[in-house]
Design a protein with these regions (language model features):
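Short, surface-exposed beta-strand-loop junctions and turns on beta-sheet-rich folds
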Residues: 57-59, 78, 154-156
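Extreme N-terminal tail/first-helix region
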Residues: 1-23
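Charged, gly/pro-rich active-site loop segments
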Residues: 2-5, 84-172
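Catalytic micro-motifs at enzyme active sites that drive phosphoryl/nucleotidyl and oxygen chemistry
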Residues: 74-77, 126-128
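Alpha-helix boundary recognition
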Residues: 18-19, 64-65, 108
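Generic structural signal for secondary-structure transition and capping sites
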Residues: 22-23, 68, 112, 146
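Short, solvent-exposed aromatic-acidic interface loops
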Residues: 54-58, 108-111
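Short beta-strand segments
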Residues: 21-55, 61-63, 69-75, 83-88
Length: 172
């Protein structure tokens, strides 16, 4: 397999992982405090990850002080050889308002249950979520480095890509 084909295949497997998972754990560090939070997300073809959160939340306060973050996406498994997932490093920032509609539409497409929750909320909690969904802040996590772990290919199997000159390359 050529290096170009290998890169293309690796990016496709990363995209598949992003598509097939729903939560990402974002880790922040600012001053002497670190924090992590799991959030629902959507992603785009550039491997950017978008999530919604309150400006007052601890992980967002960390991002506002230090935009460099790390993250993981994985399934909870009990067998070492089933461990698969992504480790990521990059920057996170608040998304400009003009992109809000497209990102929220992506949420509606990825999360089937969100239609009923937002359009026909039943409980007080659902009504609260529906109201907040339209005003909550949107953030982008722009990875600069991604590691794909897949122990089904052999214990400790990992492949990495990184951004160089705005292009994904295999990290050697």
């Amino acid at each position: 397999m050529s290096s170009h084909d290998h890169l293309k295949n690796l990016i496709q497997r990363i995209e598949l992982s992003l598509t097939n998972h729903y939560t990402i754990s974002i880790a922040t560090a600012a001053k002497e405090e670190s924090w992590s939070a799991s959030v629902f997300y959507v992603s785009d073809q550039k491997l950017n990850i978008y999530f919604i959160s309150f400006d007052e939340s601890k992980h967002i306060q960390g991002i506002l002080k230090n935009k460099r973050v790390s993250a993981t996406i994985n399934q909870d498994v009990s067998d070492w050889m089933q461990i698969k997932g992504l480790q990521l490093q990059g920057v996170a920032y608040k998304v400009p308002e003009q992109h809000r509609k497209n990102i929220l539409n992506a949420y509606r497409q990825k999360f089937d249950s969100i239609h009923e929750l937002l359009d026909l909320p039943k409980t007080d909690d659902e009504k609260k979520i529906a109201k907040q969904f339209n005003s909550i802040s949107l953030f982008c996590f722009e990875p600069h480095w991604i590691r794909l772990l897949d122990n089904s290919l052999g214990f400790g199997s990992k492949e990495e890509i990184e951004i160089k000159n705005q292009t994904w390359l295999i990290k050697e």
